[in-house]
Regions:
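PLP-dependent enzyme catalytic core of the Aspartate aminotransferase-like
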Residues: 30, 34, 41-46, 62, ...
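Active-site C-terminal subdomain of aminotransferase-like
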Residues: 172, 179, 184-276, 281-283
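N-terminal "arm"/small-domain region of PLP-dependent enzymes with the aminotransferase-like
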Residues: 1-52
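Conserved PLP-binding catalytic core of the aspartate aminotransferase-like
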Residues: 265-272, 276-308, 331
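Conserved N-terminal alpha-helix of the aminotransferase class I/II PLP-enzyme fold
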Residues: 37-85, 268
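Conserved PLP-anchoring active-site segment centered on the Schiff-base-forming lysine
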Residues: 83, 93-113, 133, 264
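Active-site phosphate-binding strand-loop segment of PLP-dependent enzymes
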Residues: 125-174
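Conserved PLP cofactor-binding pocket of PLP-dependent enzymes
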Residues: 57, 307-328
Length: 350
């Protein structure tokens, strides 16, 4: 177990050592960007540290409607609703969806979308897709809800959804796009850029604002009727609102986000080039580079740590899950950082 007294950026101070940090998230690196931190400070001075009232109360803060309008536009949906965390947003979405039909979970769906403790499918995803299409099309008297992630950061995979075109009945499709929003698509609109437009799929998108944007908060976007129903739920009315300063900083940072997204894409491309002939796995050009597992002593994690390079390696999403070795790239990294990582991976034999 490693400890630090500082928040990591491209590096992290650990036990008196300044180590390269290839772990965590905050893909755009905004949490360490001076301009973004200045906007957060300005937002705090303008709005304080919280909005001290329920969003269902008789006094409303117009800032929330501004960010919800901007997010629904970005995500190409009719309406959006923001929460104080991505987990809360996902839980609100799934607790709404459970009343819309039988939940059909995709394999390895993130725990944020779990309704209680669902029995997730154990088969591979393609088999699950075939069975799901057959089940929905063969049961015209039933209502179904498809539940899935759009991006799996543990396997560095972007899931495809073109198979939704094969459905002959209308379904609600609840998708967690936490690792897509801000990263994928020409304007950072996320996975909606490649989701199929079909009359039988009604999308309800949920996402954390932390993974790309470095903000504690979450969003659910979809059809206006679904969002209106969510606003009548205790998840919305009884929870503390998104910190206003976070909403302010997000609304003021459009150009900065695009700049940092371009830097991130350049860094991803550079490390893809360096690792092209290695066992590093990243087929979709995500910020997540999957590293092979070895039984060596020392382990790859310890080998890199001894050389002041920290990668991601821990059991997730559950304590008994197998640790996954990953190198996470952000917009903050320099080419020399990735060259150093590549050098040590080569020395280890990756």
């Amino acid at each position: 177990m490693l400890y630090t007294d500082t928040t990591p950026g491209r590096t992290v101070m650990m036990e008196g050592r300044n180590c390269l940090f290839f772990s965590g998230f905050s893909y755009l690196g905004l949490h360490q960007h001076p301009a973004f931190k200045a906007l957060l400070m300005t937002g705090t001075e303008m709005y304080g540290t919280l909005f001290p009232s329920s969003r269902a109360g008789n006094l409303r803060l117009s800032l929330y409607e501004e960010i919800e309008h901007a997010l629904c536009t970005l995500l190409q949906q009719q309406a959006a609703i923001v929460f104080s965390s991505g987990y809360l947003a996902s839980q609100a979405a799934i607790h709404y969806a459970v009343n819309c039909g039988q939940l059909l979970y995709a394999p390895d769906t993130h725990p944020s979308l779990w309704h209680h403790l669902p029995a997730l499918p154990l088969q591979d995803r393609e088999t699950w897709i075939s069975q799901t299409i057959e089940k929905i099309n063969d049961h015209p008297d039933n209502s179904f809800v498809i539940v899935s992630d759009t991006v799996n950061p543990l396997t560095s995979t972007i899931h495809h959804f073109n198979w939704l075109r094969e459905l002959r009945r209308k379904v609600l499709v609840v998708l967690d796009d936490s690792h897509g929003i801000g990263i994928l698509g020409p304007d950072g609109q996320g996975s909606i850029h490649f989701l199929p437009v079909t009359d039988n799929a009604r999308y309800l998108l949920t996402a954390s604002l932390a993974k790309a944007y470095s903000l504690e908060g979450g969003v659910v976007a979809g059809h206006a009727a679904d969002i209106m129903a969510l606003k009548r739920m205790p998840f919305f009315s009884a929870s503390t609102s998104l910190m206003p300063a976070n909403a302010y900083a997000w609304l003021q940072s459009g150009e900065l986000m695009q700049k940092m997204r371009r830097l991130l894409q350049q860094n991803i491309a550079y490390l893809l080039h360096l690792t092209a002939d290695t066992k590093v796995y990243n087929p979709h050009g995500l910020p997540v580079f999957l590293l092979p597992q070895y039984d060596n002593t020392p382990s790859l994690v310890n080998y890199l740590s001894d050389r002041d390079v920290i990668i991601s390696s821990f059991a997730y999403p559950q304590p008994h899950s197998m640790p996954v070795n990953r190198a996470i790239v952000s917009a903050l990294h320099l080419q020399e950082d990735m060259t150093t990582l590549h050098q040590f991976l080569q020395e280890f034999g990756v």
